[in-house]
Amino acid sequence: MTYRDAGVDIDAGNALVERIKPLVKRSFRPEVMGGLGGFGALFDLSGKYKEPVLVSGTDGVGTKLKLAQQLGRHDTIGIDLVGMCVNDVLVQGAEPLFFLDYFATGKLDIDTAAAVVGGIARGCELSGCALIGGETAEMPDMYPPGEYDLAGFTVGAVEKSQLLDGAQVREGDVLIGIASSGPHSNGYSLIRKIYERAGSPADLVLDDGVALIDALMAPTALYVKPILALLKSHGEAIHAMAHVTGGGLTENIIRVIPDGLGLDIDATAWILPPVFAWLQREGAVADAEMWRTFNCGIGFVLVAAPAQAAALEQALDAQSLAHWRIGQVVTAQGDERVRIG
């Protein structure tokens, strides 16, 4: 018997590497040392930082991956994977430096894997982050035919003096919410149940003219480049930041707020995007459940000094980022630290 007889095709893996090399190399930065194929990937950190603090993150895309496989949409799920990781390390002011991925499947389909990794490379390129390595694991009997799993890993850096840890947050600080591109990569176990209960309406068009499946599969917004530019020009105005992921608005912003303080969020400050309105209506989802499951149209939040909030908003306008003042930091009232109304 051979390894191929057992279900592992080394030649297919090598063919995939050759297919993705040009895509991966487009994401490289000058600090990347060497190419693909080594036992470890190399990145030279010596030239840019005085006192670098490394910030690491890892994530997946949840069961959005199941929907992507169901719909045969493999080309953008890699962007989601990158977004979930790089937006997280961005919260602490870090510039994502490099990214690694893990792709696991029962039987390697080169076209599918190349589409997925192409999306990862594109997400890295859009985030200024080098895709310097990864693992493609072909594991017979571990996954049903046509299915695969993904995980991503990123490392960023920030000057120690510029690290954002929430310590500067004060009562009265303003919450500026930046628009999401859709559900991003959270809440998809509920989304898939609602979609199936509604009869999997692949042809349905939402009130804004966007097809439902396009809205559900819209790639996670990549906030890295605009937010890094904002930190460079208005960093003193930003006291904390939050990436709105699993747990929604209720559980994510509060993670960067010190004890003794809470949040008063004005849900009338922005209009619930059509895809979320459809999900709430079709799934009969209560408001409180919406807030703690989905981003509801707000993908990233700046906690800003009130005197400088207007300048931040002007800078966001200049970058064509939709945004709203969605609330403020208040003194916490007992155990209830987040009020949305």
Swiss-Prot record:
Keywords: ATP-binding, Cytoplasm, Ligase, Nucleotide-binding, Purine biosynthesis. Pathway: Purine metabolism; IMP biosynthesis via de novo pathway; 5-amino-1-(5-phospho-D-ribosyl)imidazole from N(2)-formyl-N(1)-(5-phospho-D-ribosyl)glycinamide: step 2/2. Its EC number is 6.3.3.1. The keyword rRNA-binding does not apply. Its main location: cytoplasm. One of its GO terms (cellular component) is cytosol. Gene3D superfamilies: PurM-like C-terminal domain (3.90.650.10), PurM-like, N-terminal domain (3.30.1330.10). The keyword Hydrolase does not apply. It is found in: Cytoplasm. GO terms for biological process: 'de novo' IMP biosynthetic process; adenine biosynthetic process; purine nucleotide biosynthetic process. It comes from the Bacteria. One of its GO terms (molecular function) is ATP binding. It catalyses: 2-formamido-N(1)-(5-O-phospho-beta-D-ribosyl)acetamidine + ATP = 5-amino-1-(5-phospho-beta-D-ribosyl)imidazole + ADP + phosphate + H(+). Belongs to the AIR synthase family. NCBIfam families: purM. This is Phosphoribosylformylglycinamidine cyclo-ligase. It comes from Xanthomonas campestris pv. campestris (strain ATCC 33913 / DSM 3586 / NCPPB 528 / LMG 568 / P 25).
